[in-house]
Amino acid sequence: MKKDTKNLYKEKIVPSLMEEYGYKNVQLVPKLLKISINRGLGEEARSSKEMDANLKELAVIAGQQPTVNKARKSIAGFKIRDGMPVGASVTLRQDRMYAFLERLIHITLPRVRDFRGISAEGFDGRGNYNLGIKDQLIFPEISYDDVNQLQGFDISIVTSANTDEEAYSLLKKFGMPLQARA
């Protein structure tokens, strides 16, 4: 699975982007650098049972153990103390990144109810794409019986593209179901 996506990039996407943008060198062609999956835990961070369930869920989705993000400073209004766990994140690179991207495009996103493609508004101006998932049940690895509370997370796809247009073209060639740009 992961080899297919990597080979698709090397054999089809690189020559296509070189022709489209007139790159002289293969190293100039935009590529995927990493995919970050992040989840804020909120109230669940106070209970170790809920925290463990969230970490296990992220590990199953990503195929890699997540790291716990801790508060850097205390905020009384949010009842947060310095060093308290507030979220969890996973950074995928290389083969795991390509495997996750393929599962996201071909298995997970089509399971979204009333799916008409993902918004092209998620680009940040520097060639990276951010996507919010509202419901973890769209991943086939997650069983409805194991979920205590529906909770979403953020997926950031970091590329080496200089512009959003290049990143859009790169992700579109990978098969990402992006809507037309406005």
Curated annotation (Swiss-Prot):
Belongs to the universal ribosomal protein uL5 family. Binds 5S rRNA, forms part of the central protuberance of the 50S subunit. One of its GO terms (biological process) is translation. Gene3D superfamilies: 3.30.1440.10. The gene is rpl5. Its main location: plastid. Part of the 50S ribosomal subunit; contacts the 5S rRNA. This is Large ribosomal subunit protein uL5c. It is found in: Plastid, Chloroplast. It comes from the Eukaryota. Keywords: Chloroplast, Plastid, Ribonucleoprotein, Ribosomal protein, RNA-binding, rRNA-binding. SUPFAM superfamilies: RL5-like. GO terms for molecular function: rRNA binding; structural constituent of ribosome. GO terms for cellular component: chloroplast; ribonucleoprotein complex; ribosome. Disulfide bonds: none annotated. It holds the Pfam family Ribosomal_L5.
